[in-house]
Amino acid sequence: MLENKKHKKMSLSGKSLLMGTLSTAAIVLSASTVNAATNTDTVDNANASQVTTVKASASVNKNDNSGLKENATNDKVAGTETNLNSSLNSGKETSSQVNDSKEDSSSTQVGSTPISSAIINNGKASSDLNQDSDNISDHFKDNNSQGQSSTSSEKTELKGKIKEIVNNSGIDVTKLTNDQINNLNKVNFDNDPQDGTKLTLNDLDAIGQALIRRDPKYAVPYFNAKEIKNMDAAETKDAQTGKTETLEIWDSWPVQDPITGYVSNYKGYQLVIAMMGMPKKNDNHIYLLYNKYNDNEFSHWRNAGSIFGYNETPDLQEWSGSAIVNKDGSVQLFYTKNDTSNGKLNDQQLATANLKLNVDNNGVSIASVDNDHVIFIGDGKHYQTYDQFSNGKNRNRDNYTLRDPHVVEEENGDRYLVFEANTGSNNYQGEDQVYRWANYGGNDKFNVNNFLSYFGNNDDQALASVANGALGILKLSGDQNNPTVKLDDVYSPLVTSLMVSDEMERPDIVKVGNKYYLFSATRLSRGTKGEITRLANKVVGDNVAMIGFVSDSLTHGYVPLNGSGVVLTASVPANWRTATYSYYAVPIEGKENQLLITAYMTNRGEVAGKGNNSTWAPSFILQLNPDNTTTVLAKLTNQGVWVWNGDSENKNMIGSLEKDSPNSAALDGEWGKFIDWDAINSYSLKPHQPVTPNVPTTPEKPENPTTPNTPDTPRTPEVPTTPVKKTTQSELPKAGAKDGIAATILGAISSMLGVIGLAGISKRKRNN
């Protein structure tokens, strides 16, 4: 027994000696290891002043008739300032001047009044604005306190054209990592397939900056919140329950004259079709509303009921579209069928139906709905199909769209549909789009910074790789009352937003004189530049906009209005009563330089308070200038005005951003109210799901959550905020004299501990 105890003691001593020996060896190894280590510079975003000049190439569609085969290239407005710090202090834009006229000299009242104090975004106050704005543009601020980089013998070299571009950008090439250089060397400078005009990342950035600085040329006017009412005609029989319910109303469109686009005078009435449904329910169906032509009174609107009856279900919904009058007096409706049955994620299809109406002393009623059928589900080449989407990669981040058909009739009787979609296999989504230089659209510094920013942010890069928004066009065939689509009449897109955005909603073409104006509602949060969305949400409290393009031809040649495409931008927080969206432009009879802008007001789900339902907004005037610019005018109407006349203007609707003003744009209690983005977006359509970022730090709480495919599904964020980057080094620092001394001391301490006899160390499990 004594021998055994002695043996055990000797064994413990042996372990201690072994630990001492190993620790001594560790001193030598640690010193050599530290001396051999090199530091990889981290890359962060910093603010940089960038002046960009952009040229938009508007290419002809592939499948156009021979008479349409021409290229139109137009210069965008130059001099877009992209320094957010400076733009936040500016209420004006140094772009082209607005043509003044005696009649229309009034301008929108939206100015530079601070609004950030009115906003709380998911618990995070906007006082961090300056800190966040410092992280927008310049990707190359060196965070390494030692300023060291890899030796030239270890560095990969830039090659070819990208080398010159990086040098021109003013970026220190020595600060680039090998991974960054390898990615830059993969940049694709080839010409794009001819898929119409590009909405570039630089355009998206400029749109965001205009929104953030609340540029008065583009900002939606402030409305007097105390004047806003729910719609009387929204108290009606619900399409799903068959019972009288209080409904909300949002996306709406008038029945229009097929040639002029004016709101049709249909036997003395104006007709509007609208999406309606119960608050906080998965209830999305379309109804017919009517009022006497030229009647400006909101309370006079009446509801003719659900177009497709009262046995509707949440699984089969109708979304927005357009409508015109046929030669026989019937109404041709174009709309979106949305199928969410059997687990589908918004299987959208373009559809049409023929409506025959009765008009008598009791008003307007629906006599019959005939020839209801789907006319287009995508062709796979020009436009993505649901099967391509559902079988694709990164589906949890992808956003499938094929909706919002807008009908246009040419003078020769040919009818076309313009619609929201995603690009097909001819120019498809994918990681290769992030390498396509034409998608960036800015100067060298902007392009390089943002290219590397994608590869430093897994979330934005993943979104960019699936972003493939498109505004499409096709030609209709067959009888007016029962149209069809031939595959040969499916043209390539008018506008694409590959890598930039996955969603450009509700396209609307208005012909004014000899020009075609193409508009679309969108959100910065559907784009792939997360920083600009977060900043917009902090400064303004919302990120919605309307973009626009102009061409001399219906089927090709569109160039962005105002240089970047920005036409309208949000001006108040999304949870205020006076927040607006789903903008729709209507031509004004007798006015070739003005359009009437309609919208819905108050986001769905009672986000502005109990009983404050989504309703029609007051309309306002958009000035069209001869130099392809636009200006918002402070000419407001009652709610629900679709036909502008001499009695339409109502100055009592003009609001103010002053908190205690009697015409404040905010209701009592809205100023400084917490913005719950889950609730704001809970009725949107995007099925994105968040992905855990592959970084060691804890992500911040997302400020811009996405929307689910169905309104009753619990909401998750669409664009999680970029996680806070670690300020500590993730690798061993490059050794200096102090580092060597520190390593020696640590090794000596380890030796002492080993000699003392930490025998238990040998029992620890290794972490594999």
Curated annotation (Swiss-Prot):
It comes from Lactobacillus gasseri. It holds the Pfam family Glyco_hydro_68. Residues 1-36 form the signal peptide. Optimum pH is 3.5-4.5. Coiled coil: none annotated. Optimum temperature is 55 degrees Celsius. Activity drastically decreases at 60 degrees Celsius. This is Levansucrase. Fructosyltransferase that catalyzes the polymerization of the fructose moiety of sucrose to produce levan polymer and the fructo-oligosaccharide (FOS) 1-kestose. Is also able to convert raffinose into a fructan polymer and a single oligosaccharide (most likely Gal-Glc-Frc-Frc) in vitro; however, L.gasseri strain DSM 20077 is unable to ferment raffinose. Also displays sucrose hydrolase activity. Sucrose binds at W250, D251, S320, R403, D404, E503, R523.
